[in-house]
């Protein structure tokens, strides 16, 4: 036997091979217990939870049935064996026929319940199920316990009557012996015991002198189960009649099975319809039992909006409110801050919506797209037996998904298992390919480089998990548009790592990287402030919109008034013209020409062009002006309408005349800047992108950017000029060398753009 064959027979290796199989999606998303709980609401045990029907149609049925109510079906068994037996011309047992009857009765109950609601789509579906006459008779054949009703078969009725009579005689005999004085010393109790289908007595040893019979069994205490000789003959008759009853039932089952074979196609249809109705009932009962809501997946919307969604695995969840409006969501930020649970929540909501399973969510304000496939790369695929490393396993999973379209993919800790810089470049390429194939992706990562690279793509959203530095714990909230800090040192301290080791680690970490983290924190702070300002602006914008609507209404009103006035003037003009014509008819021609000439002169006198004078603001040297809410002094007049101005702090700026506002006449004495605190300008930013600009435009933008950065109090900024031919980089270097406020500048680290970006210290 070869080594390969031996390995294949090794049970340990076989178990390891099974472990390499991907986990079911519901297990990866922590939905296993939730789905198991949901399955308990079905009338029939089933593996699949999918709805084998049109989702839109099923959603309509759910709403209609929820408003009226649906009676729950009895529990039923699997129907596959019934179909197989009938297909092979076999005979069904009575309990299998009863499984058919239970389904038929449920259909009939539904049809009767929805008879008054003819306007419903669900009524149309039920009405389409027309039972053949044979099945109406079959429903009446069995009782609620699945036994043949009395009167259905005369022979069977006679046998049952005989059986009942004999059982009564047997009971009477046992009762007589149980209360007999001769047998009292040997009786353990006076009850009738049932063993092997026979009623018998429980006796002590030595009974043979008092009674004769057959010992059926001994008890654990050494007593004897005895069938008296007089009851033995009756027991034989009972057994004989029981056999005759079984034969009669078998004959009836054979007859019924032959009839059912003729309706095999209808039975397949019946089983399928019952399973669908059972699925609806299970979903409704599950939703009512746990106060859950349904979300119909959208086949047109691409964006995902979740409001007050709670993952089922969480006992005290903080409801998730999130808008995922682009093709990819990159989640960064603090360790143990809820990034993985956010990823699982997004995929879980899509999975549950796809199968119309109710969830804890505000359905009216939520939108979930329909995805053909949902995949999760969450667990570590490492397997030593199959020589698969973590990174190799991840690549194997990715390679299987590269051809997929219209799927939702979730990847947790995407950088797992290899070098960070190489992984960033590799995953950027893989993710961009998947995005081009109309897929939506959610990733969690601590790679700042990967986040920066992907942020350049317009279809990528950034989301950061936030950390409360005062309380020293995650807030389990998220901020859009920023790259979050991991807070690895703080997390390690929170989970018991000694502080002196944390300080030592920070020293190894380096000052430059710590500054980068400070920049990231400042960026997050500015983003939060900007978010608050945006809310105020939205309110102000709404007020302006209301004013605009009121103004438009007033304009329409004034237009209507103007139109009425115009009609009145035209009417007056026509009347005057008619009077003039009648007057002219009575006068001579020369007098008429004089009047017309005179009127023409009067009209020309009032004919003037109303030109709006253009106000051109110009400034003189030593004249005060206002620049972006700052008081400045004009020092020098430059070309193309530019001025060199000096702020109250003594900084000199280059500004266009259109940016300046005249406030008062300049003082005669030289302007002395007082020591005041100047607020940061709203336009201040940490980064300037000059790529694609002409040299002259780029230098103007750079000058204004540095001015704003100085006013904002920034000590370090980033200027992106790109690599390209190097012309723009040359101009930028020359400008920075000659700028009086630039302390130094250097190329940025590789993860921030390398030689295509300059870090400028002010």
Curated annotation (Swiss-Prot):
Instruction: Name the protein family.
Output: Belongs to the DNA mismatch repair MutS family. MutS2 subfamily.
Q: What's the superkingdom here?
A: Bacteria
Function statement: Endonuclease that is involved in the suppression of homologous recombination and thus may have a key role in the control of bacterial genetic diversity. Acts as a ribosome collision sensor, splitting the ribosome into its 2 subunits. Detects stalled/collided 70S ribosomes which it binds and splits by an ATP-hydrolysis driven conformational change. Acts upstream of the ribosome quality control system (RQC), a ribosome-associated complex that mediates the extraction of incompletely synthesized nascent chains from stalled ribosomes and their subsequent degradation. Probably generates substrates for RQC.
Q: Which residues bind ATP?
A: 333-340
Please give the biological process terms from Gene Ontology that the record holds. mismatch repair; negative regulation of DNA recombination; rescue of stalled ribosome
EC assignment: the record states: 3.1.-.-, 3.6.4.-
Spell out the molecular function terms from Gene Ontology.
ATP binding; ATP hydrolysis activity; ATP-dependent DNA damage sensor activity; endonuclease activity; mismatched DNA binding; ribosomal large subunit binding; rRNA binding
Give start and end of each Smr domain. 688-762
Q: How does it assemble?
A: Homodimer. Binds to stalled ribosomes, contacting rRNA.
Q: What keywords would UniProt list here?
A: ATP-binding, DNA-binding, Endonuclease, Hydrolase, Nuclease, Nucleotide-binding, RNA-binding, rRNA-binding
Alphabetical list of InterPro entries matching this protein? DNA_mismatch_repair_MutS_C, DNA_mismatch_repair_MutS_core, DNA_mismatch_repair_MutS_sf, MutS, MutS2, P-loop_NTPase, Smr_dom, Smr_dom_sf
| Stored Pfam families | MutS_V (PF00488), Smr (PF01713)
- The protein's name is Endonuclease MutS2
Q: Where are its TM segments located?
A: none
